[in-house]
């Protein structure tokens, strides 16, 4: 009887202290892909908030194209789209505020510039060169410096064209430049690093036995961001990037469907 009770107590202790099954301590970063505000999926962003509460990560990484910035695109524009870019920036800052409120003290928050955000510098270069240096950059527009001065987190911004600016352990996180059928394999062969990227809105994971690469889907509302009447093959997803004390990284891919996901064996939904 005593042996049986001892086994029950041990199992209960492990259940309530899952870190005892993990071995050496890990840091975990929540990785969020393309949002395309104002065409983001509201269920997706709320789900991210809920997952932050559930896993208490050490940081958050947004892979770029957080904003759609259609207003300054060179492509033809839907006349029914009437949002101002300033309004979209404010909406994205509200999302960041919601996520950061749930993150622990001194969490690292990395915001990457995507090709959609880089439209701002391209627009200035192409249409109003004389305003170069007068229009605020994205770090200013998103209040990165102010957030670092008065907030409880460490905020970082990574320019689009510095592909290896954001590195966590032995993993490079980038927005992405390629857009072909087997894009994860393309990036693996090109960079020869562990790589997580967005851009394509598709979920692909590939490994050569030494390194791995992952195209981490998206978090947008597909009916608003897709520009084709046929199926896209897109997939909403979230990444959990784990890094050990030696800087070795592993990635858990969490697929998202209609505001639902399974994280560490538990279904979370909004």
Predicted regions and their residues:
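A generic local structural motif
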Residues: 17-18, 46-49, 96-98, 159-162, ...
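Conserved beta-sheet core of the metallophosphoesterase superfamily
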Residues: 169-255
């Amino acid at each position: 009887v005593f042996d049986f009770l001892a086994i029950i107590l041990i199992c209960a202790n492990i259940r309530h202290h899952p870190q005892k099954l993990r071995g050496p301590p890990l840091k975990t970063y929540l990785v969020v892909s393309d949002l395309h505000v104002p065409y983001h999926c509201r269920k997706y962003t709320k789900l991210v908030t809920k997952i932050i509460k559930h896993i208490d990560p050490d940081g958050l990484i947004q892979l770029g194209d957080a904003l759609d910035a259609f207003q300054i695109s060179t492509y033809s524009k839907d006349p029914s789209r009437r949002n101002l870019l300033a309004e979209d920036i404010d909406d994205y800052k509200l999302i960041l505020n919601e996520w950061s409120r749930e993150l622990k003290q001194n969490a690292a928050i990395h915001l990457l510039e995507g090709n959609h955000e880089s439209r701002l510098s391209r627009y200035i270069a192409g249409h109003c060169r004389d305003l170069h240096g007068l229009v605020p950059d994205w770090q200013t527009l998103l209040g990165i410096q102010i957030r670092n001065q008065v907030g409880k987190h460490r905020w970082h911004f990574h320019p689009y064209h510095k592909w290896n600016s954001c590195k966590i352990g032995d993993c490079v996180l980038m927005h992405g430049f390629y857009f072909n059928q087997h894009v994860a394999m393309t990036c693996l062969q090109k960079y020869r690093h562990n790589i997580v990227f967005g851009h394509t809105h598709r979920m692909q994971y590939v490994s050569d036995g030494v390194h791995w690469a992952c195209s981490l889907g998206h978090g947008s509302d597909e009916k608003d961001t897709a520009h084709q009447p046929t199926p896209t093959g897109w997939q909403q997803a979230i990444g959990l990037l784990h890094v050990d004390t030696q800087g070795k990284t592993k990635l858990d891919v969490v697929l998202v469907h209609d505001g639902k996901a399974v994280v560490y064996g538990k279904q979370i939904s909004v």
